[in-house]
Amino acid sequence: MFRTAVMMAASLALTGAVVAHAYYLKHQFYPTVVYLTKSSPSMAVLYIQAFVLVFLLGKVMGKVFFGQLRAAEMEHLLERSWYAVTETCLAFTVFRDDFSPRFVALFTLLLFLKCFHWLAEDRVDFMERSPNISWLFHCRIVSLMFLLGILDFLFVSHAYHSILTRGASVQLVFGFEYAILMTMVLTIFIKYVLHSVDLQSENPWDNKAVYMLYTELFTGFIKVLLYMAFMTIMIKVHTFPLFAIRPMYLAMRQFKKAVTDAIMSRRAIRNMNTLYPDATPEELQAVDNVCIICREEMVTGAKRLPCNHIFHTSCLRSWFQRQQTCPTCRMDVLRASLPAQSPPPPEPADQGPPPAPHPQPLLPQPPNFPQGLLPPFPPGMFPLWPPMGPFPPVPPPPSSGEAAAPPPTSTAVSRPSGAATTTAAGTSTSAPAPGSVPGPEAGPAPGFPFPPPWMGMPLPPPFAFPPMPVPPAGFAGLTPEELRALEGHERQHLEARLQSLRNIHTLLDAAMLQINQYLTVLASLGPPRPATSVNPTEETASTVVSAAPSTSAPSSEAPTPSPGASPPIPEAEKPPAPESVGIVEELPEDGEPDAAELRRRRLQKLESPVAH
């Protein structure tokens, strides 16, 4: 306060000195005025004195219409004034050809009236937070709104007639500025009426928030239209109004916020009426039954939010007009009620097992897959797995006296039913008889959660997948820059973490692809083949010996025939039974004999000369 008084006294003394010096030089009134207006230093001193007088006038009018200004009102006034001064300086650059003392005075008056519009808006908003409003407050606000409305209308009318008579000039800017101030006065007046009606009623007015929301929506739409028309006219008749960019952006943002609030509030109120249950008397007794919005006890008509906080229905309706969060925990009620609106997705188990497109061959149980080697994977974990239903249980192993028969597949090597398999050591094991019961069929490998292999799905080409990244050995292999790139909450840190997850996903896909290839190769191998000798004559002789059925074990091995001589046939040897011969001579389904059948025919040709 003391600094302000010193500055005003210094400005007054400097102005008196300049006027006295000019009068001392000219000795007459009119030449003194001409000298002051033509001298730049004298005009600068006079401008400073004019600003001081405007400041004093503002102080006086503030005391009359507002009394003591609150700290929040002063803060808002200073914050908006700095932006207004900056926009005024930009307007001076746009209208530099019209720069004159009258032009500066008009902009100063516009800034002066804007300050009172802002103070009136803050003071009317204070009515909602103040329980006691005196009659002096009503008289001040009503008289100020009446005065501001009259001044705005007069300046708009003056600018309109000036544009009609003199054409487009700087009055175009003042006309639109005062028109926007008129919409502000209209908004202040509607809010004042709504607050006054609410103060007169004993109970809180539930529909006040609705009217205020639609009032802001209506006046915001008018402001956006005015700014768009002003920008269009200024660009067409003068130049681009750079000083109007910020207020136009603020008006558009405020209008967008009003539209969003209207939509979200209606959605929140609809959810409150349809989704949120009414609070029971037991729930009200279990918690503090005081509504934190209105500070009154809740007896009936209370709603329970998804966060289990309870409020009055009318209080929640008024609260949701402004924000869609819980008044206590600030939980987003729209996001919390989103899963309740959408039905849950059906479980994959309800769909049942998918139908098998083609009969798939069964794999023999490999000995190198112990039980529980691989744990079952959760469904949908890897994109390469096809959807599958429940898997059949693994059949029990065959008894010690029975041998599992290999499945007759096209990929596995088939053997005759009555033939015995000869091992590398020379011992032979007899196969089951044709009339015997076959052993249990082999199922999927134990420990695998899928029936291998994918016979109906072709393998993708190896170049269809992205190159596999090299997995790091640990954090010790990362540089400090790479570690810092993974830490933090900024965008580059999130992108680094997402890239790491993509690398992990690629490695898992590559591992599943290799498992798929391994199982496909394993399915095509079939049962293990016996070890064969290098000499073809010995192989032929061993096959002949194994092909002859015997009821008792031989005491000694059959002699190996020399090359070129046919082997002797024992007297007790008999031709095979017709049933077994018929079974042996059966061909596969495709009509072509396999390797075992061809070998049997060659043996028959070798035996035919000896038999005769």
UniProtKB/Swiss-Prot annotation:
Q: Which residues lie on this side of the membrane: Lumenal?
A: 26-41, 120-140, 191-224
Bilayer topology reads: Multi-pass membrane protein
- Can you tell which superkingdom this protein's organism belongs to? Eukaryota
Q: Enumerate the residue ranges of region (HAF-H domain).
A: 474-529
The EC number(s) this enzyme carries: 2.3.2.27
- PTM info: Auto-ubiquitinated. Deubiquitinated by USP19.
Q: Name one GO cellular component term.
A: Hrd1p ubiquitin ligase ERAD-L complex
Provide Cytoplasmic-side residue ranges. Answer: 1-4, 63-98, 162-169, 246-612
Q: So where does Zn(2+) 1 get bound?
A: C291, C294, H312, C315
Q: What class of enzyme is it?
A: transferase
Spans annotated as Interaction with p53/TP53: 236-270
| Acidic residues bias locations | 586-595
Establish whether keyword Ubl conjugation is in the entry: yes
Q: Which UniProt keywords apply?
A: Developmental protein, Endoplasmic reticulum, Membrane, Metal-binding, Phosphoprotein, Transferase, Transmembrane, Transmembrane helix, Ubl conjugation, Ubl conjugation pathway, Zinc, Zinc-finger
Q: Where in the cell is it found?
A: Endoplasmic reticulum membrane
Q: In which pathway does it act?
A: Protein modification; protein ubiquitination
Question: Which residues are reported to carry the modification Phosphoserine?
Answer: S608
Q: Name one GO molecular function term.
A: zinc ion binding
Here the segments flagged for biased composition (Low complexity) are 416-434, 539-559
* Membrane-spanning residues: 5-25, 42-62, 99-119, 141-161, 170-190, 225-245
Quote the InterPro entries the UniProt record gives. Answer: HRD1_E3_ubiq-ligases, Znf_RING, Znf_RING/FYVE/PHD
Q: Which SUPFAM superfamilies match?
A: RING/U-box
Q: What is this protein for, i.e. what is its function?
A: E3 ubiquitin-protein ligase which accepts ubiquitin specifically from endoplasmic reticulum-associated UBC7 E2 ligase and transfers it to substrates, promoting their degradation. Component of the endoplasmic reticulum quality control (ERQC) system also called ER-associated degradation (ERAD) involved in ubiquitin-dependent degradation of misfolded endoplasmic reticulum proteins. Also promotes the degradation of normal but naturally short-lived proteins such as SGK. Protects cells from ER stress-induced apoptosis.
Name of the featured protein: E3 ubiquitin-protein ligase synoviolin
UniProt lists the gene as Syvn1
